[in-house]
Amino acid sequence: MAKAKFERTKPHCNIGTIGHVDHGKTSLTAAITKVLAETGGATFVDYANIDKAPEERERGITISTAHVEYETEQRHYAHVDCPGHADYVKNMITGAAQMDGGILVVSATDGPMPQTREHILLARQVGVPALVVFMNKVDLVDDAEILELVELEVRELLSSYEFPGDDIPVIKGSAVKALDGTNDEIGRNAVLELMAAVDSYIPQPERPLDKPFLMPIEDVFSISGRGTVVTGRVETGMVKVGEEVEIVGIKDTRKTTVTGVEMFRKLLDQGQAGDNIGALIRGVGREEVERGQVLAKPGSIKPHTDFSSEVYVLSKEEGGRHTPFFANYRPQFYFRTTDVTGTVELPEGTEMVMPGDNVKLGVKLIAPIAMEEGLRFSIREGGRTVGAGVVSSISK
């Protein structure tokens, strides 16, 4: 009897299957659970159960995603699979299911198709660190030369989107054979080979605690006789009493010292990733700091106004706009804890953006925000979410 609860002693990693419709992403997901179930590293989840992925709402957007978990000798994995192309786009842009790496599934009978290309581009834009390729359905191709050509095509495509196409592991196999257990060479063994590649090629993600200290400011209080307290949830890293930090965003960056940390009215000597804390800061007046700024380790993050982004625009059905928007559209961009107005620049040759579209937008904010590539944001009009995006590159 497989244990229902995994022992979380191994390092954890979030991955997902991406690729063109009907190339076998869901079959492969099922096959991985079946093969790893033999060693007690998973509970077998069949195709039908993964395919009827439940709907979730993330930032007001409806996304269908299936989650399975399994473990190898090396790691514990949370694996996400989406039923439809639109779900992938929304998932990757909102970061609803964080991906530390991806398994790109390409059918040997078709080779790379439009969504193969689109998912690779999305992975590049939203900062998925590494991909591994599973060439599926090799049982349907008799000619070994065709397999070589498909592999070459996939590698070239990956390189064209700045992934290391020559180095990425490409494993050839058949998810269906792994599921029905009829041909171990391209079935079970290929899945084991794939998981070994995922274990070794996808880098172990850095834990939030190991990153530099960052806390988005949610509220500011003044405590008579003590000074100014800023509250928020520590996103990454840790802060100790007596350490110097910077207040970044909206106004000029300034340094201060954290002279006290409290949580649930108790004084602590430090606050760390995941904690909701109040930080007492020295020499800063109540009116000199505001929601939307961040407290951060000095030099670790800079404020910016101009960036390009990958954006999903909510459809009318999702409660988004009913009409398209054009160049110089001026909505609010919601970063972490606050809205900042910004102007939008459309890609060359794009006249307008329709609700339901996925588009690359240039943005110019009226005030600088502490940001880095990969930061997620919402686009809002009068408090209503009309889009979701991720910073893909910073220009100013």
Curated annotation (Swiss-Prot):
PROSITE patterns: G_TR_1 (PS00301), G_TR_2 (PS51722). It is found in: Cytoplasm. GTP binds at residues 19-26, 81-85, 136-139. The keyword Iron does not apply. Residues 60-64 are annotated as: G2. Its EC number is 3.6.5.3. Residues 174-176 are annotated as: G5. Pfam families: GTP_EFTU, GTP_EFTU_D2, GTP_EFTU_D3. Residues 19-26 are annotated as: G1. Keywords: Cytoplasm, Elongation factor, GTP-binding, Hydrolase, Magnesium, Metal-binding, Nucleotide-binding, Protein biosynthesis. NCBIfam families: EF-Tu, PRK00049.1, PRK12735.1, PRK12736.1, small_GTP. This is Elongation factor Tu. It comes from Rhizorhabdus wittichii (strain DSM 6014 / CCUG 31198 / JCM 15750 / NBRC 105917 / EY 4224 / RW1) (Sphingomonas wittichii).
